Amino acid sequence: MTQEKRETREEEVARIRSYLASQAMRRTPEQLVETLREAHQQFLTATAAVTAAAFRTIPREGEWSAADVLAHVCTISAFDERSICGVIEHGKQPKDVDDALEQAPSGATREQLLADIERYRERLIAVVLQADPQAYLDIVWGHNEFGKMNWREWLLFARVHTLDHAHQMQAIAVALSPFEEL
């Protein structure tokens, strides 16, 4: 029996970065939007699997609650919408992003955060579908781990990021499934 070598974080980042660079230019904006929509649906399904009672519970020390994940995805969705739309519509240079955990505001509800994400995504999609696919590809902005990307790479990164957090939500739902029985 052979042991599979576990990928280091650096190797994972390099693999994802290579995927983003090649696929963002190979796919049309419509195809990129479709992949984001599919990822968003997976995220919604995973989020719905977390019970209301478990929504703000941290599964294990040092991990995120479902509320924290949802707030983070909302923050990054707002960033994607502002940044990508700003480039496409105005040729505006976005600021770099530091993709880090932030705790969910105590008053934020699941419904409000989901509605905000939906609003950001719909505006982003509407602008992307009207965009010249070759416009402003020289404008790049950075992610603290994945480096500088143009708007098409950022759009595909939104898919990767959303799927990553969909898997995180699934793990939270599984870890906290006995929570309701307590």
Question: Where on the chain are the PLM-derived regions?
Answer:
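Acidic/histidine-rich alpha-helical segments that form the ligand environment
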Residues: 35-40, 44, 100-138, 156-158
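Short, contiguous alpha-helical
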Residues: 2-15, 19-21, 56-98, 138-182
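Structural signal for well-ordered, non-membrane alpha-helices
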Residues: 40-48, 78-81, 85, 118-132, ...
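A short, mixed-charge helix-start or loop-turn motif at secondary-structure junctions
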Residues: 22-29, 102-110, 144-151
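Short low-complexity stretches enriched in small and charged residues
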Residues: 22-29, 34-36, 79-82, 120-123
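Short acidic/polar alpha-helix capping motifs at helix-coil junctions
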Residues: 6-10, 16-22, 31-34, 46-47, ...
